[in-house]
Amino acid sequence: MLKYTWPLLIFGIVGILNQVLDKILFPFLYPGADMREQLGIYGACVKIAMIMAMITQAFRYAYEPFVFAGGKGEKSKESQALVMKYFVMFTLLAFMVVVCYMDVFRYIIRRDYWEGLRAVPIVMMAEILMGVYFNLSFWYKLTAKTYWGAIMSAIGCGVLVLVNVLLVPKIGYMACAWGGLAGYGTCVLLSYFIGQRHYRVPYPVPAILGWFALALALYFLRATPPDTLSTFHFPLFTFDCLWLRLAYNTLLFAVFAAALLWSERALVRRVMGKLLHRLPKNK
């Protein structure tokens, strides 16, 4: 029992470190005199990205008992693959809501902190990858090889620290966002390739990568205010008119939502049929 659980303890501790370590390291790495101000900007903007963290956390509590109840059969593997696809689709839909309507969400924080909004999409994408990593993590739990979880999480944490050490002196709090993305991305890659050797699950990788590609393409096409710094400091479309920005970004969101509905039209048709069947009929 101890052999199974102690790596999970390390896994949990490292997971907490991945969430807070960048903020702990920042004061020691940032060379500017405005360190507290910069850290405050980053911390405030991360609050918006916590929308994604709440989604992934709720998913974790609901999904883990379902997987362990299903065991290690082929049907369970197919269910895990299907859930992974829908998890990515739903979280990317939430990502599109936030980035397309940042003009609305930015009022959650003070106007003085708006310059840090360019970190929000990166932090949100890191949270999505954290959820993907959680989905991938069941292979070592079901095969009683939990030490892999501790090893991979430690490597991911090391990548986060390395990115922060190298980039915080150069690009400030943006390095914290990129460090989280790099750390979780490393964990995802390690868990997928190692896991497929020990516990093969037929994840629809091309479809998942396609949804990421579509979401990122629409993200780069979104409209921003003229005075807003984008993630890469060169927004493609800047409109002065708020309503024009919202209308244009709504169109981009509609493209993504329509693509989701079209790809899952058979499922949507079945769900709508069941809902309509439950409606009271006029006599």
Predicted segments, located by residue:
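C-terminal transmembrane helix end/exit motif
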Residues: Y61, N135-F138, L181-T228, V255-V271
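Interfacial/gating helices of multi-pass transporter permease domains
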Residues: M1-Y4, L8, F26-M50, W114-L117
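Membrane-interface helix termini and inter-helical loops of multi-pass transporters
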Residues: F26-G32, V104-W114, P226-C241
